Amino acid sequence: MCRINGESTLSFLLKRKKDESTKILFATDMHGSEGTWRKFLNASAMLKVDVAICGGDLTGKMIVPVVEGKDGKFAYYLMGRTHTIDSSGLEKAFKDIRGIGYYPYSTNEGEYKEMTENPKKVDEVFHDVMTSTLSRWFDLIHEKIPSGTRVVVCPGNDDRLLVDKLIDEHKDVINGEGKVIDVDEGHEMVSCGWVNPSPWKTAREEEEDKLEARLEKYISQVKNVKTAIFNFHAPPFQTRLDEAPLLDKDLNPIIQGGSVVMIPVGSKAVRKMIEKYQPFLGLHGHIHEASGSMKIGRTHCVNPGSEYAEGIIRAFLIEFKGDKLTRLQRIEG
């Protein structure tokens, strides 16, 4: 069942007995990389998981205009240089652009000029392309995922607030944000895609005290926190799961002695919730470089990390039976 504010609203997970093993696949931070999303779905089907969970930051960050010129050629700028192709190269170009997490957009010289002069036009195009891409991605679930597997997506800090509505409207995917989901008869999952402040000033950031209040509100819906799964996009502060490069005022990594200086950037509120409630599992993401697993008290916490720009899926295959964790396996490919 799925509950919002403590009320049962939707039954979408197959009932499983307490003595049966439950298997989940957890990945995060795909950032518009179509290859990574497809691998996530394929791996979920191949591994026959009960629940496939995408922990946040599903959408891409920018569009790449593919501009048709008067000569019938197409030009686009990617990876530091301008590419010129004819119509026979469009399919490959679109695939390459999508593969690294950008959104290709076919346009003409007139519209492209308007986009360079009007930021509002760029935002409108981005909205339309992001919306159509997500809809197409979610349509793949029915094609690739067995009916016995359910897919849960929780928007992350880089996902615009309108993404929630797009997820809610699609019948094959469940929006985890702020909800309690019965993964099986003995384990509930509560999800939050909001994070503590970052230098990037993204859509779902808030101060630690506000994030703590939000998490407390979400957790209050859980019946048994000791067997719960906390699917919180922000990793807990000062753990191996939250180390990221220290940045200068221009947002460039600081290098000392030939090495990038790394600092903890996770959430103190998330760590406080884990230490206070000691849930069964903590599923985290947000910090791409900090993949790994660790325990905080009795709680097993993971961050798969992300290499979305390379089209690589990084995930954890997690299996448990009752209060016993029987598998915690890193998946990469």
Predicted regions, residues:
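Core catalytic region of metal-dependent phosphoesterases/phosphodiesterases
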Residues: 2, 11, 36-184
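Binuclear metal-dependent phosphoesterase catalytic core
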Residues: 13-14, 32, 180-185, 202, ...
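Active-site-proximal beta-strand elements of phosphoester/diester hydrolases
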Residues: 21-31, 186-198, 229-233, 300-306, ...
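Divalent metal-coordination and catalytic microenvironments
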Residues: 29, 37, 52, 57, ...
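Active-site environment of divalent metal-dependent phosphoester hydrolases
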Residues: 31-35, 59-63, 154-164, 181, ...
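Catalytic phosphate/metal-binding cores of nucleic-acid and nucleotide-processing enzymes, i.e., regions
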Residues: 34-39, 47, 65, 254, ...
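Active-site-proximal segments of metal-dependent phosphoesterases and phosphodiesterases across multiple
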Residues: 119-131, 229-278
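Binuclear metal-dependent hydrolase catalytic cores centered on His/Asp/Glu-rich metal-binding motifs
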Residues: 185-228, 260-264
